[in-house]
């Protein structure tokens, strides 16, 4: 059996530009592509944190060190400059590959510079203000006890 697994994620990147008059794709800083193990032409899902839009496209390499996250083509109707997005790539793996593979999870700052690289898809960096799904039962318990 084959499974579709998350292989890479660039988390909470800021869209630097959106250009409707382009053939399509997302332009990503080559440094971020390397960190996330993304290849030019690879399919990615883009999730817009600000408006909930989800779309699929492919990656085009952007200039290293620029922090570029550029939305190109029709997707510019859905994702705007300044929006926070998550770029996710999936891979189809057999059972053995699933056991051996670790995803690449890249966290970036407001300028799209890498601040953390890990492999836990549910990790929330300290000080990020994000909540990991693995903490939900602990959070619910603390909320309930504060209501008593």
From Swiss-Prot:
Its cofactor is pyruvate. Binds 1 pyruvoyl group covalently per subunit. It is found in: Cytoplasm. It is an enzyme of class 4 (lyase). GO terms for cellular component: cytosol. Keywords: Autocatalytic cleavage, Cytoplasm, Decarboxylase, Lyase, Pantothenate biosynthesis, Pyruvate, Schiff base, Zymogen. One of its GO terms (biological process) is pantothenate biosynthetic process. The modification Pyruvic acid (Ser) is found at residue 25. The active site is at 25 (schiff-base intermediate with substrate), 58 (proton donor). Pathway: Cofactor biosynthesis; (R)-pantothenate biosynthesis; beta-alanine from L-aspartate: step 1/1. Substrate binds at residues 57, 73-75. It catalyses: L-aspartate + H(+) = beta-alanine + CO2. GO terms for molecular function: aspartate 1-decarboxylase activity. Heterooctamer of four alpha and four beta subunits. Belongs to the PanD family. Catalyzes the pyruvoyl-dependent decarboxylation of aspartate to produce beta-alanine. This is Aspartate 1-decarboxylase. It comes from Rhodococcus erythropolis (strain PR4 / NBRC 100887). The gene is panD.
């Amino acid at each position: 059996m084959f499974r579709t697994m998350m292989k890479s994620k660039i988390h909470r990147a800021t869209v630097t530009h959106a250009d409707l008059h382009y053939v399509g794709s997302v332009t990503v800083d080559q440094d971020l592509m390397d960190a996330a193990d993304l290849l030019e032409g690879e399919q990615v899902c883009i999730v817009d944190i600000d408006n909930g839009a989800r779309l699929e496209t492919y990656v085009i390499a952007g200039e290293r060190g620029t922090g570029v996250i550029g939305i190109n083509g029709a997707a510019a109707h859905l994702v705007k400059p300044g929006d926070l997005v998550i770029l996710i790539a999936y891979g189809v793996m057999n059972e053995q590959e699933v056991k051996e593979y670790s995803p690449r999870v890249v966290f970036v700052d407001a300028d799209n510079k890498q601040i953390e690289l890990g492999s836990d898809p549910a990790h929330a960096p300290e000080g990020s203000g994000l909540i990991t799904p693995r903490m939900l039962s602990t959070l619910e318990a603390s909320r309930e006890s504060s209501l008593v």
